[in-house]
Amino acid sequence: MFLAQEIIRKKRNGLALSAEEIQFFVKGITTNAVSEGQIAALGMAVYFNDMNMDERIALTTAMRDSGTVLNWQSLGLNGPVIDKHSTGGVGDVISLMLGPMAAACGGYVPMISGRGLGHTGGTLDKFDAIPGYQTEPSSELFRKVVKDVGVAIIGQTGDLVPADKRFYSIRDNTATVESISLITASILSKKLACSLDALAMDVKVGSGAFMPTYEASEELARSIAAVANGAGTKTTALLTDMNQVLASCAGNAVEVKEAIDFLTGAYRNPRLYAVTMGLCAEMLLLGGLATDEADARAKLNRVLDNGRAAEIFGKMVSGLGGPVDFVENYSKYLPQSQIIRPVFADTQGYAHSMDTRELGLAVVTLGGGRRKPGDALDYSVGLTQVCALGDKIDASTPIAVIHAQSEDAFAQAEEAVKKAIRIDEVAPEKTPEIYAYIRAADL
């Protein structure tokens, strides 16, 4: 039997907690035996004194086990259960293509996603733009769609990782969100509750990333790869670029459109393609669905080119309550804003740098993201045709097209976009889409 205050005291004094102490405290979070003040105190103690790798693994697995842990064995799946998670960015629409692509190659992808946070867009918000799509289905329907279609992208259900839900809300209000140990446990407890065989982790770097520096992003990526592998899930973390909008757009309905255009081959943004392929190929390799990277990429290109990935996306949408002909007729179903107009730079030259975070906040201001939890979203608004760094910009080349519901909203977004995209006489140096892979062998 332990006392919560003694566990807090031990961590406050910089000592390592045992797995049993961590399990006791997490159980108290779940049952309310531990108070908000005690949770906040432990969070702050961890923030200042950190956790070693054994503590991080113990915290992650204890939070994973605080609620339902999904079991796929009874379904008799004939392939690996694989997934990816992103720390979030702007125009990060990867999940919508990657899930169906991995499923088309023989994987099963039970993807539990989140809503928008701060300047970053949420995968669930994009699906809410599709009429009828159930982002919170019953667990029976979720399992059925995963088994029959190969992929289902839904929101976190109440019985998954309840300890994280309570801990996170307290961290958010007590300035302990930025702890690498606590971020690692929060992300992975949710993913590992899905009983994955393999996970590809997308850790963003740059002006639109959650972590402020490359070094902080790398530290988080290493922590996630080490803890996930230590907890028994084959995991690779990729460090990917978020110094500019990843897709050609940012918003909800506009990103769904770009995802379908990508899957059908109508248009594939080269940067989006590079990161999607990198993550998806890693999932196939970790899941044993490909012999090497070249084989993985060939398989993925095949399911894009033969239409199988697009077909699976359509089946997932209809399986979860959306229109049966959504892929073929998405323009009939996706909402459109009142004003769709380009914005031009005041000077000529090259798109030199981008404050990606500010572009994400411009979408929030338009109504496409939340200023506070519970805000209703306007799924039609956002940015499209966002220029890429290095693009030549002149008087006839828009730096973006704004989708707004009023002239006031357009004017506000126009000012934000102009401020966020810097034009220079000199083209910037090209940066890679993927900076590094952190695999189990690298730890």
UniProtKB/Swiss-Prot annotation:
Subunit structure: Homodimer.
Top-rank lineage group of the source organism: Bacteria
Function: The enzymes which catalyze the reversible phosphorolysis of pyrimidine nucleosides are involved in the degradation of these compounds and in their utilization as carbon and energy sources, or in the rescue of pyrimidine bases for nucleotide synthesis.
Protein source organism: Shewanella sp. (strain MR-4)
Pathway where it operates: Pyrimidine metabolism; dTMP biosynthesis via salvage pathway; dTMP from thymine: step 1/2
Gene Ontology molecular functions: 1,4-alpha-oligoglucan phosphorylase activity; thymidine phosphorylase activity
Recorded name of the encoding gene: deoA
The protein's name: Thymidine phosphorylase
Family under the similarity heading: Belongs to the thymidine/pyrimidine-nucleoside phosphorylase family.
EC class name: transferase
Catalytic activity: thymidine + phosphate = 2-deoxy-alpha-D-ribose 1-phosphate + thymine
Keywords: Glycosyltransferase, Transferase
